[in-house]
Amino acid sequence: MKSILEQLSSMTVVVADTGDLDSIKKFQPRDATTNPSLILAAAKNPDYVKLIDKAIESSENTLPNGFSEIELIKETVDQVSVFFGKEILKIISGRVSTEVDARLSFDTEATVKKARKLINLYKNFGIEKERILIKIAATWEGIKAAEILEKEGIKCNLTLLFNFCQAVTCANANITLISPFVGRILDWHKAKTGKTSFIGAEDPGVISVTQIYKYFKEKGFKTEVMGASFRNLDEIKELAGCDLLTIAPKFLEELKREKGVLIRKLDASTKINNSIDYKFEEKDFRLSMLEDQMASEKLSEGITGFSKAIEELEELLIERLSEMKNHKLISAN
């Protein structure tokens, strides 16, 4: 009998949610997603010290003469993300998602500028933009930035997405892909209700993604739906049939080991017959987020968490740069 992972792969594009190259080699997904936390975790792995060093050296060669250490570190953060993305693309056949600095989440212009830079860094390695998804937090400013980028042919993945309003606003902006979070929605409801278990289709994260998926298919939106942030296998199984699911290696391993019959839960032909065409202007979007305590809190928490991960990555790079300088001094003596 086929494994659950094999069956899932026949109805959904399985994506690896990791920056760990060995895990990606092991599971051979079509696509892969990264975020600041995953890049930080990979950067801490001693196996990838050489990759970090190459990113630092590349940054030194990229910057004009007279650059400061701060400028070098900021440049290296971008290059580290691209270096990992480049190595991932050697393994997979599809796309890699590379995230814009989360600290720019409320700045449309800066987000557009950073995304263009990341695409150019990939281009310098001979990697075309068609293989890259630029990840941007689904704030109003982030969605507007993605709308601009999409018109330039730069495909985007809108992340930290927690409600229907965010999803529909992305679809109306013709964004390539959205990543509605499942597990973080579950976390919030557990904390607020005191209920320790939400089974299968009762899981609030599953309910959210199912609603978004069905509405998109009914309205004919081209925006792909990629469920993300899972806490257990049941959540993944309940979304079998979704366009894509990005799954952490530990769950990929469990799905690979498990046998049994996987039932398709989502299908493009399954519709909810909702005749309303939802459109959210900026004031509507902001009010919707304000009224949705879960989405508002989780979006804020996600941006804060990813921002802290970038700051920690910057500290790690400062330490590594110091080690490299000391090594050069010792070698010179």
From Swiss-Prot:
CDD domains: Transaldolase_TalAB
Entry annotated with the keyword Cytoplasm: yes
Gene Ontology MF terms in the entry: transaldolase activity
Biological process terms in GO annotation: carbohydrate metabolic process; pentose-phosphate shunt
InterPro entries in the record: Aldolase_TIM, TAL/FSA, Transaldolase_1, Transaldolase_AS
Reaction it catalyzes: D-sedoheptulose 7-phosphate + D-glyceraldehyde 3-phosphate = D-erythrose 4-phosphate + beta-D-fructose 6-phosphate
PROSITE patterns xrefs: TRANSALDOLASE_1 (PS01054), TRANSALDOLASE_2 (PS00958)
Principal location class: cytoplasm
Keywords: Cytoplasm, Pentose shunt, Schiff base, Transferase
Location(s) in or outside the cell: Cytoplasm
SUPFAM superfamilies in the record: Aldolase
Associated pathway: Carbohydrate degradation; pentose phosphate pathway; D-glyceraldehyde 3-phosphate and beta-D-fructose 6-phosphate from D-ribose 5-phosphate and D-xylulose 5-phosphate (non-oxidative stage): step 2/3
EC number(s) reported in the record: 2.2.1.2
Assembly behavior: Homodimer.
Record's function text: Transaldolase is important for the balance of metabolites in the pentose-phosphate pathway.
Protein family membership: Belongs to the transaldolase family. Type 1 subfamily.
PANTHER family found in the cross-reference section: TRANSALDOLASE
Protein name: Transaldolase
